Amino acid sequence: VLFYYAGEFTPAMIAAAADTLKGRLASEEAGSAAKRKVFSTFIEMAQNVLHYAAAHAEPGQPQPPASGAIAVGRDASEGDAGHYWLVCSNPVHVEHIARLTEKLSALRAMSLAEIKESYRTQLRNSEHADNDALSKGAGLGLLTIARDASAPLEYSFASTPDPQARTALFHVKARI
């Protein structure tokens, strides 16, 4: 494991974590393309936690900060040696599970060429904000992660101790 963090995600935390990861990647014996992809994927995953982690405040209380976990590591097994992995986990609203599953299932079925074409199409999509009210960006985060990954993204949802069952724990894994 090169990096692990669990807790509140803020812009300052992401910047500090990015600096730490950069330093650790600098000492790795990997090509610059692999390091760039790991760093880019890390930033996208951290931004996803920051922007999409479900947090519930009691009525009249301020919204709590986004929380989650992110880890970066390198495979040591002979067949996978040199490959990096990144895992991110955060709570999501249960009503978003179907939407996330649809997006991730579609990404898993795409070839790299199809992912790149979808990315280029999305870059030109000036109506994204009108068509996807839940997305806080240009809709490029998961496409960026999938584009940089060497295998289809893995994902799962798990129950949380939320007594009202409003959230689930979302996990996504990318291999670089």
Kindly label every feature range from the protein language model:
Residues 13, 17, 34-41, 137, ...:
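Short amphipathic alpha-helical segments
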Residues 1-29, 107-120:
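Helix-loop-beta hinge of the Bergerat
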Residues 21-43, 127-132:
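Conserved short strand/loop->alpha-helix "switch" segment adjacent to the catalytic nucleotide/phosphoryl-transfer site
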Residues 52-176:
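Conserved beta-strand-loop-beta-strand hairpin that lines the nucleotide-binding pocket
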Residues 5, 9, 30-34, 133, ...:
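Conserved aromatic-histidine-acidic binding/catalytic patches
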